[in-house]
Structures are given as structure tokens and as C-alpha cells.
């Protein structure tokens, strides 16, 4: 049936109305101007619209519905996919069950949706919106929105974009499956990665890039290229795998599971940590903090300013200190533990170590040689001093002696040797030799064997301790990694008579051992006859009594006590 002017209804049960319309499909309906409904049960209306497929619908101006059940409306739109829908201006619904709207949009993937201006949804089930955004072919379920952005990975999401602060186009790109790119000039390349933030000038530096799988880059011009890496802040790089983290400004976390923070720091050793400014942690599991510090040894720690911890498990702190020996510690200012001096410790200023496993107090010149004021040598136990030993109150030099009866002796008694033995007893008036006076508080105490049994090590005929070189085996963790490297060291030769099943009791804790002052100012018991400026000798009870010669009496300190000088 035709009505109007110049219309043609050639299809069975077709209906054409308006001006120059054509309804050639069965049960088709055309109306308006120059419309064509050629598909069965199709409907064309408006001006120059074409519905050429079964049950298709074209309306508006210059629209085309070219596939079954497709719907085109608006101006110059095309619905070419089965059950597709195109609306707006110059939109194209190409894929099956797709939907385009807005201006110059394209929905090519199955069940895709494109809206906005010049957006393209090529991936199946994808969605584009905004201005010139796109999802690429193969990017199923992707979503691109904003301006100029592209989502190329399956289930990826790109948003934001537009222009940088200089006005340069700066779109975002999400190419990794399940990735997310947002902000300005960002890129998410890795699987399930996330890039956010941007750049002030994309022509000079790109925005954040999340290249590693499960990585996260945020801030300005950051990069996370390692697996599960995280970069944040300004121009930071997290390139180490398995959880590296770079934050702050111009920091780099390049080792596995490393962490760099602060300003221009680098953590390159496995599980290393660098913080502060210009610090570097290159040793495995090392830590560098402060300013311009370097922790290059495994498990090393450098802190302060311009310090270096190079030895395994070494520690450098302070200013310009260097710990080159394994397990060593340098602190203070311009101190150095030299290579090979394992386990040494130095503190102070302007000095270097002399021995391994030893303690050093440096006091070198600012311009001149490096020096030590004090050294305790670990292997021998020797104490080296470049100065005076000062005792604030105690005055005598004493040595430890054992009593002949095994009983304690209180301070203030004169003592002598008991016969031909090395043991002592109280001195009497008839003794021609006086060893000294039992001291209550000596300034120096010798032969105390306070730290060990006096025969713990093998000695020669002159009582000199004998030493040997021993090999220290390497130590590995449960995964086979070397925790401590093998080495050699000098040790005293252990006496085979030593019994480790017995507990050693130091002489100072045993009643039979007493300190005898043999030189210096000593307090002595007296019978009340001694006079300052006079002399004394022991009576039969081992206490002082006035004498014509003997020990000089310096002063009376109590009714029954005087201070004498022993030499």
C-alpha cells in the first residue's frame, strides 16, 4: 500500500508513505523523504534513511540499519551488526549487539558500547566514552574513558588523559590484562598493573609507567617495571622483582624486594633498603641511610654522612667512616676498619684499625697521620694506651696471692710468704721480708685471672701464650646462601687440661685469694703508736707498730689506722 507522492510499497503487506519512499520488504514500512525499508518487517523513517535487513529500523537523516534487528537513528549513523544500535551523529555500530551514541563513535566488538566523541570500542564487550578514546581488538571487557585514552588489555581500564600542563596531548594507555591507567600520560603494561598520576611535560618525560605484572606506578614520571613493584613520588624507578618499592624523588629500587626512599637513593642488592639522600644499598639485605652513605657489604648498615659499610655484616656510622672488615663497626669521624680486620670496632676521629677482633679509640690529626689513643687487642687481650692511666682515688699497685691456710685476709694487714711456698700469711715482728699490705681498693690489680682460668691456653717456658691459625668455616642458611664467608684467624692454643664441664670462679670471688699492695699509698692497721712522719713495721699480729725504720707513715686516718707508703 502506498500513500503520498512517489512512494513504492512493493513488498507483501508493505506500507510506504511520505515522499519518494520505498517499502520493498515484506511487511516493511517506509515514511518521510527518500527512505528505504527493504528488509522484511523493517522500518525506515525520516530523510534518506535505509533499513535493509530483517526487522531493522532506520530513522533520522542518512541513517542505515543494514543487519537483522539493527537500529540506526540520528544523522549519518550506521547499524551494521546484528541487533546493533547506532544513534547520534556519524556513529557506527559494527559488531553484534553493539551500541554507539554521540558523535563519530564506533562499536566494533561484540556487545561493545561507544559513546561520546570519536571513540572506538573494538574489543568484545568493551566500553568507550569521552573524546577520542578507544579499546583495541582483543581487549575484551575493556573500558576507556576521558580524552585520547586507549585500553588494549583484557578487562583493562584507561581514564583521564587530555593534555599536560604545557597543553601537550597526554593520553593514557592500559595494555596489560586487568590493568588500570589513569591521570595524564600514564601507561599500564603489566598484567593487573596500575599507573596513576602524570607528568608536567609529556615531551620531556612520560607519566608513570607500570610495566611489571601486578606493579603500581603513581606520582609524576615514575616507573614500576619489576613484578609486583611499586613506584611513587617523582621520577622514581622500581625495577626489582617481587615487591621492590621506590618512593620519594629520583630513587631507584632495582634489586629483588628492595626499598628506596628519600632523594636520589638506590637499593640494588636483594632485599636492600636505601633512604635519605644519595645513599646506596648495594649489598644483599643491606641498609643505607643518611646522606651519601654506601652499604656495599652483604647485611651491612651505613648511616650518617659519607659513610661506607663494605664488609659483610659491617656497620659504619657518623661522618666519613669506613667499615671494610667483615662484621666490623666504624663510628665517629673519619675512622676506618681496614680490610682483613674482621670483627674490629673503631670510634673517635681520624684513625684506622691495627688488629682484627679488637677495639680502637682513634685520635689522629686533622692534617697529619691517623692515630689511636687506645687499643684493646682481642686476640691477646693487650691494652695499648697513648696517655696516662688515671685513678681518681685508689693509689696502690697490687697483685693477687693465695693464702696458705685457705682463709680470707681482711685489708690492712702486713703479709709475707709462708716458708718456701708462693702462698702468703700475716707477717710478724720476726719476719725479715715483708711482701706488702692487703689492699682494700688497689688502683691496679695484677694476676687476678678474672676473665678466665689462668691455664686456659698453652704457654712456653717463659709463660708466653702460644697461637695458631684456624680456619673458620662458612655458614649457609637453609636455602644454601652464604651467610658468613669462610676465613682464617689467629687464636690462642687451648690447653688440653681445660675441663669445660667445670664452672670457673674468678679469684676475686674466692676467699683464699687476696689483693696485696706492693707499691704505693696503702692503709694499714696499727696499734696506736705510729706517728705521721715516722716509720713502722709489723708486730706479731701483722699490724703496724712504731719503728725506727721501715715504712714511712704519711698520716693517721683513724685511731687504729694509718696511711703508709710501700715501695
Describe these PLM feature segments:
Residues 362-567:
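Extracellular receptor-binding modules and their adjoining Ser/Thr/Gly/Asp/Asn-rich linkers
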Residues 1-384:
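Periodic small-residue-enriched repeat registers in elongated scaffold domains
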Amino acid at each position: 500500500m502506498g500513500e503520498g507522492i512517489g512512494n513504492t510499497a512493493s513488498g507483501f503487506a508493505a506500507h510506504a508513505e511520505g515522499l519518494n519512499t520505498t517499502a520493498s520488504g515484506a511487511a516493511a514500512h517506509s515514511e518521510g523523504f527518500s527512505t528505504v525499508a527493504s528488509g522484511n518487517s523493517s522500518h525506515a523513517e525520516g530523510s534518506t534513511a535505509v533499513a535493509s535487513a530483517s526487522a531493522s529500523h532506520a530513522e533520522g537523516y542518512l541513517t542505515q540499519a543494514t543487519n537483522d534487528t539493527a537500529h540506526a537513528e540520528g544523522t549519518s549513523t550506521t547499524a551494521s551488526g546484528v541487533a546493533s544500535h547506532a544513534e547520534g551523529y556519524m556513529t557506527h555500530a559494527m559488531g553484534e549487539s553493539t551500541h554507539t551514541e554521540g558523535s563519530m563513535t564506533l562499536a566494533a566488538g561484540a556487545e561493545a558500547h561507544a559513546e561520546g566523541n570519536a571513540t572506538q570500542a573494538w574489543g568484545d564487550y568493551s566500553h568507550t566514552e569521552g573524546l577520542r578514546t578507544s579499546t583495541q581488538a582483543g581487549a575484551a571487557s575493556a573500558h576507556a574513558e576521558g580524552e585520547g585514552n586507549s585500553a588494549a588489555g583484557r578487562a583493562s581500564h584507561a581514564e583521564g588523559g587530555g593534555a599536560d600542563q604545557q597543553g601537550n596531548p597526554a593520553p593514557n594507555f592500559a595494555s596489560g590484562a586487568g590493568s588500570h591507567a589513569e591521570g595524564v600520560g600514564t601507561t599500564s603494561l603489566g598484567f593487573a598493573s596500575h599507573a596513576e598520576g602524570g607528568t608536567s611535560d609529556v615531551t620531556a618525560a612520560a607519566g608513570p609507567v607500570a610495566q611489571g605484572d601486578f606493579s603500581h606506578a603513581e606520582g609524576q614520571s615514575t616507573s614500576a617495571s619489576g613484578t609486583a613493584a611499586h613506584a611513587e613520588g617523582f621520577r622514581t624507578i622500581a625495577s626489582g622483582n617481587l615487591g621492590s618499592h621506590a618512593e620519594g624523588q629520583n630513587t631507584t629500587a632495582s634489586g629483588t624486594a628492595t626499598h628506596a626512599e628519600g632523594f636520589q637513593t638506590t637499593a640494588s642488592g636483594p632485599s636492600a633498603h636505601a633512604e635519605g639522600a644519595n645513599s646506596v644499598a648495594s649489598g644483599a639485605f643491606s641498609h643505607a641511610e643518611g646522606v651519601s652513605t654506601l652499604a656495599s657489604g652483604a647485611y651491612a648498615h651505613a648511616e650518617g654522612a659519607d659513610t661506607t659499610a663494605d664488609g659483610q655484616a659491617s656497620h659504619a656510622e657518623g661522618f666519613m667512616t669506613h667499615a671494610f672488615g667483615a662484621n666490623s663497626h666504624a663510628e665517629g669521624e673519619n675512622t676506618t676498619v681496614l680490610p682483613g680486620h674482621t670483627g674490629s670496632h673503631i670510634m673517635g676521629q681520624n684513625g684506622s684499625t691495627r688488629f682484627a677482633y679488637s677495639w680502637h679509640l682513634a685520635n689522629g690529626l686533622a692534617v697529619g697521620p691517623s692515630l689511636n689513643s687506645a687499643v684493646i687487642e682481642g686476640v691477646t687481650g693487650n691494652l695499648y694506651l697513648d696517655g696516662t692511666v688515671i685513678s681518681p682515688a685508689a693509689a696502690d699497685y697490687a697483685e693477687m696471692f693465695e693464702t696458705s691456710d685457705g682463709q680470707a685476709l681482711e685489708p690492712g694487714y702486713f703479709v709475707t710468704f709462708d716458708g718456701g711456698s708462693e702462698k702468703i700469711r700475716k707477717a710478724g715482728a720476726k719476719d725479715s721480708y715483708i711482701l706488702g699490705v692487703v689492699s682494700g681498693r688497689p688502683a691496679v690489680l695484677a694476676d687476678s685471672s678474672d676473665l678466665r682460668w689462668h691455664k686456659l691456653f698453652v704457654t712456653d717456658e717463659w709463660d708466653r701464650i702460644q697461637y695458631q691459625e684456624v680456619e673458620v668455616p662458612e655458614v649457609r642458611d637453609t636455602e644454601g646462601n652464604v651467610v658468613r664467608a669462610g676465613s682464617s684467624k689467629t687464636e690462642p692454643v687451648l690447653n688440653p687440661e681445660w675441663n669445660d664441664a667445670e664452672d670457673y670462679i674468678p679469684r676475686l670471688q674466692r676467699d683464699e685469694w687476696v689483693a696485696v699492695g706492693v707499691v704505693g699509698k696503702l692503709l694499714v692497721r696499727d696499734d696506736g703508736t705510729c706517728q705521721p712522719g715516722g716509720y713502722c713495721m709489723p708486730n706479731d699480729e701483722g699490724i703496724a707498730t712504731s719503728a725506727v725504720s721501715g715504712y714511712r707513715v704519711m698520716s693517721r686516718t683513724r685511731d687504729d689506722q694509718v696511711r703508709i707508703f710501700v715501695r
